[in-house]
Amino acid sequence: MSNIRLIISDIDGTILTSNHQVDEQLIEVMPELEKANIPFVLASARSPLGMQPIAHKLGLHDNPIACYNGALVLEGDRTIIQHPVDKAEIQELLNYLSTYYPSVSVNIYSGKDWITNELDKWSQLEGSITGESPIIKELQDTISDSEPPIHKLLLIDEPEVIQDLHQKLLSMDFPQTAFYLSKDNYLEVTAKHVSKEHALLEVAKYYDLPLEEVMTIGDNFNDSPMLALAGLGIAMGNAPEGVKETANLVTASNDEHGVAQAITEHVLN
């Protein structure tokens, strides 16, 4: 048995095949991890509702899940870690968008809720991808301090609009807020220090384990910092070269049972 006592894994392009199905071989490996008392924790930009069915399919029960890239970590329905955005800065952002970028679709995520002010073509498309339905509500109503914390915003429009907006926001004064592109037309907005790397540090601390005893698995550039930081960072075979360079090892692709193979070879072996 290796010295790995905790596994943190990305979802899309990692444990899901190109057909968006959970890898069957990985499902078969899960009981062996449970028997060895090695938690398997999912970390993704997805919302809780986008992650829980996958966790359920893997039989993860109440293992923590790091949602919104670690802005919210849930154990069952219990919040164990959260990093909400600064509502004063979000108010400023909404004012700026309504004045200069009125066409941008603004989507707010608070806990399990997805909130938008109208079902435009972008939110309809996002709903068809995630299988979720938004709550239609005035966005200003979500910003008041009496309302629940906001964990993420997603801004969607044509690529040239979003990329122009991204550059503008980076030059503005938002000290508590981070902006990054997750697709060429998706701009994610979170609290400043939210990242999968930070989630790795917090989840390892939650389990009281040193980083040397943690294995991380991922396929994309937002996974690279957690691959570099963990005791054993595994890049998927389908990852870009730049991601593979940050990892200790490269496994097979997401369509060739890469995660199951990595666990079998480096954890259960």
Would you name each region that the model predicts?
Residues 2-6, 23, 188-269:
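Mg2+-dependent phosphoryl-transfer enzymes with acidic/Ser/Thr/Gly-rich catalytic loops
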Residues 37-41, 61-63, 151-152, 212-213, ...:
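Short active-site oxyanion
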Residues 26, 51-55, 165, 169, ...:
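Hydrophobic packing residues within well-ordered alpha-helices of enzyme cores
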Residues 3-18:
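Asp-based phosphoryl-transfer active-site loop
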Residues 32, 96-98, 168-171, 242:
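Alpha-helical scaffold elements within enzyme catalytic domains, especially in hydrolases
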Residues 103-217, 238:
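Conserved acidic, metal-coordinating active-site core of Asp-based
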Residues 58-61, 69, 172-175, 229-230, ...:
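Short, structured coil segments at secondary-structure junctions
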Residues 21-123:
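Active-site phosphate-binding/coordination module
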